[in-house]
Amino acid sequence: PKTEKRLPVFAREKELSPERISTLFGNDFNAVRDKLMLELFYQTGIRLSELIALNVADVQSHQIKVLGKRNKERIIPISHSLFKEIQAYLNLRNPIAKGNKLFVLSNGKPLYPVFVYRRINELLGSLTTLDKKSPHILRHTFATHMLNNGAGLETLKALLGHASLAATQVYTHNSFAQLAQIYTQAHPRMMRD
């Protein structure tokens, strides 16, 4: 018998508002780095392994170059405000970094997966009411929020680096409230009431 696939767990938009996120962070190196990690996960949907693999040269003014699964490279657009956050982080990072990895510890060495996982888990614990907290939850959240705000499946597939559309379709789990809202706005009889 076929087992049912679990729906992705995701945070609500208001839980990850810029104002709410800003309240958690100061201006020291660790705070700036951690906020940038959180924002990159949420605003780009990249995987933990992709974040750790990022080099400084992979960042350009409106995009980042990501090396995904099976060494597939993809370009992901970033907002101007996210690029400014990256620049502010680089100003703190460059004097201490040992190598070209974008994300480093305060001793200049590259980040490692367990460190990032634990830090994101802590941050999501302060921001959300989710039971499950991880970088991958931010990937699910990115995908869900993109679809809920009008992104198409093909676009989302490209942004997430999925090999097939079937992998992306798991994010079409709109809430009933959203389905009802779309129905009310789109069906001609509902628009007349």
Model regions and ranges:
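Conserved catalytic core of the tyrosine transesterase superfamily
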Residues: 1-193
